[in-house]
Structures are given as C-alpha cells and as structure tokens.
C-alpha cells in the first residue's frame, strides 16, 4: 500500500498549481452565484484547504481547529453550502487531472486515488459538519439580537423609560418584553415606564393580558407603568372584548404619555419665552 509520505509528496509537489487552478475555479463559481468577494479571499480559502490536506496527511487529527476556522470563515463571508460542496468537488477533479498528467501505472494510480480519498472524504465531511454548527450559532446569535430589538427599553429622561413596540405580540415575544421591562427598570432606576403600542396592529385579549401582566410586574419592582398609543380602533376593540385596563394609565399618543410621565415625576415641559 502507498505510504502517507507519497501522498504528502504528491500534493506538496503540485501545491502551487492546484492552488492556482482551484482559486480560478472558485472565482468562476462565484460569478455564477454573484458573490462580490476579492480574489485574495478565494486565494486564502484555497491555500487554507490545501494546508489542511497536507496537515491531515501527517496527522489525521491535527487539522481540527483549522477545519473549524475555515468553515466559520465560509459562513461569515456568506458562502452557501451548495457553493462549498461544488467547490470541493471541483478541487477533487483538479487533483484527479493532475494524477492523470503524471501517467502513473494503473495500480499505482488507483492506490494514490484511494489513499488521497482516505483523507479527502473525512475532511470534507467535517467541513460540512462545522459549517452547519457555525451556521446554527450565527442564526442563533442573530435571533437573540432581533429579540433584543423587538422589545427595547430606552431611557428618555431621568427615571423615565420608553418601550416602543412594533408588530404583533405572541407569547414568546411577551416573555421577552416582560424580561426586558423588569431588567430595564432596575438598570435605569425607572420610576415610570411607558409602553408605546402605536406600532402594534392588533390588541386582542391575549395581547391585553400580556400588557396587564407587564404593568403589574413593573409595579411590583417599584415603578409605574403607562400605556401610550391607544388608537380609536384599538380602544373600540378593547371595549368590545370587555378588556379591563382600569389599573393601567392610558394615553392616546406617546407625546401625551411623556407629558404625563414627567408630571408623575414632578416635572413638566414648558415653553421658553423669546
């Protein structure tokens, strides 16, 4: 059987040519996918992959961190799984072409193909595995960031904070609203919290229930809750559904809500004379 040293030597001897061939292939594939990346990026990816191959031939477990880094980089620059799979398949074609150019005896050529594939296949499998892990982590972080943006608590005056809500409110988002409210009240030492629902399209029984719960939770940590943005259609819906908001201070606009919040903290907005 052909030794690892023979495989290493074959890849090393053809490294520069393989690097150029695969870099050119990546550029061609990127044009089909409309990726806007520099030539240096593709050259770096090609070099990293060939280095991983060479390192793995010496020690099968030595390139684990490099494989993870390559997969993470592919995710970060936006390369799709399809692009990655096609690119790796093209690399094997280029490698096979180089073996044919050597015009090795059939037996020797077969052994070389088998031996290279022994390293090539597990590496590719691990790259796809690490790509999936990196992608899931990235999506998870993006989801957390979006969740934070979906219920931000903003300090507007000393001891007064506003939570502007836009879009529908489901159970999961309601939990985030509650969590951010309670943490924010403590963090900003809020005395009054305004929940602005101007951008909430529908206020049904469930949404109202979540708002009442949030208001009660804010009261329990020593602050007062004020609901702003009660549009006429929402007011009508609340009345028709028999929703009791008597324990919550309500205002039809955020401006009036802020004026009330200032009054509740012994302040007011005044006009300066000329």
From Swiss-Prot:
CDD domains: RsbR_N-like, STAS_RsbR_RsbS_like. This is RsbT co-antagonist protein RsbRA. Residues 150-265 form the STAS domain. Coiled coil: none annotated. Changing residue 205 to D: Decrease in induction of sigma-B activity in response to a salt stress. In absence of the other RsbR paralogs no change in stress response when RsbRB. Disruption phenotype: Cells lacking this gene have a decreased response to salt stress, indicating that RsbRA is a positive regulator of sigma-B activity. Its activity is dependent on RsbRB. One of its GO terms (molecular function) is heme binding. Keywords: Phosphoprotein. Acts as a positive regulator of sigma-B activity in response to salt and heat stress by stimulating the activity of the RsbT kinase toward RsbS in vitro. One of 4 functionally non-identical RsbR paralogs, it functions in the environmental signaling branch of the general stress response. Interacts with RsbRB and RsbS in the stressosome. The stressosome probably also contains RsbRC and RsbRD. It comes from Bacillus subtilis (strain 168). Phosphorylated by RsbT. This threonine phosphorylation abrogates the ability of RsbRA to stimulate RsbT in vitro. The modification Phosphothreonine is found at residues 171, 205. It holds the Pfam family STAS.
